[in-house]
């Protein structure tokens, strides 16, 4: 039996440390063995909408994501076929014309706030992880990220958090914790949890390899 890639889902609230967990696991295996698919790259294309309408996008709702495309790409990677990952432009609030070519790897990490929300995605995962972090720390991290990386203002980030992010987290993100095989507090700073994850991934890889 030919080997098959291992798929790991890493979910959690905005600013919880999902990216840090994915990066910590990535560092253990290296770019020849592992790849990361960020759900943030798979927001739906909105180029057909006026800019004023795009500004109203609720990025924390499950319907904001193009999970059909993400699932299609995961299936290709499971067959060891390359994909062209979309790029999302947060300043224009729509998908960019650019893509990122991604070669298949033995380990696929699906990282995003709602990767555990869609049953179709969960069914593709060998290991499901939820990163659990204090809400105060999450909002601080989101402030820093959105102001620095997405050109947002302090007031706009706070307004969005109170009106959208927090209620969406409570309604959609937090409930997906029940699907997790592993719950990691403190994100990528939890060295013990990361080491256990790496050991588990190696075990699953061995089980999926040719005996």
Curated annotation (Swiss-Prot):
<dbReference type="GO" id="GO:0044206">
    <property type="term" value="P:UMP salvage"/>
</dbReference>
<dbReference type="GO" id="GO:0005737">
    <property type="term" value="C:cytoplasm"/>
</dbReference>
<dbReference type="GO" id="GO:0005524">
    <property type="term" value="F:ATP binding"/>
</dbReference>
<protein>
    <recommendedName>
        <fullName>Uridine kinase</fullName>
        <ecNumber>2.7.1.48</ecNumber>
    </recommendedName>
</protein>
<dbReference type="InterPro" id="IPR006083">
    <property type="entry name" value="PRK/URK"/>
</dbReference>
<keyword id="KW-0067">ATP-binding</keyword>
<keyword id="KW-0418">Kinase</keyword>
<keyword id="KW-0963">Cytoplasm</keyword>
<dbReference type="InterPro" id="IPR027417">
    <property type="entry name" value="P-loop_NTPase"/>
</dbReference>
<dbReference type="GO" id="GO:0004849">
    <property type="term" value="F:uridine kinase activity"/>
</dbReference>
<comment type="similarity">
    <text>Belongs to the uridine kinase family.</text>
</comment>
<keyword id="KW-0808">Transferase</keyword>
<dbReference type="Pfam" id="PF00485">
    <property type="entry name" value="PRK"/>
</dbReference>
<dbReference type="GO" id="GO:0044211">
    <property type="term" value="P:CTP salvage"/>
</dbReference>
<feature type="binding site">
    <location>
        <begin position="12"/>
        <end position="19"/>
    </location>
    <ligand>
        <name>ATP</name>
    </ligand>
</feature>
<comment type="pathway">
    <text>Pyrimidine metabolism; UMP biosynthesis via salvage pathway; UMP from uridine: step 1/1.</text>
</comment>
<comment type="pathway">
    <text>Pyrimidine metabolism; CTP biosynthesis via salvage pathway; CTP from cytidine: step 1/3.</text>
</comment>
<dbReference type="InterPro" id="IPR026008">
    <property type="entry name" value="Uridine_kinase"/>
</dbReference>
<dbReference type="InterPro" id="IPR000764">
    <property type="entry name" value="Uridine_kinase-like"/>
</dbReference>
<dbReference type="GO" id="GO:0043771">
    <property type="term" value="F:cytidine kinase activity"/>
</dbReference>
<keyword id="KW-0547">Nucleotide-binding</keyword>
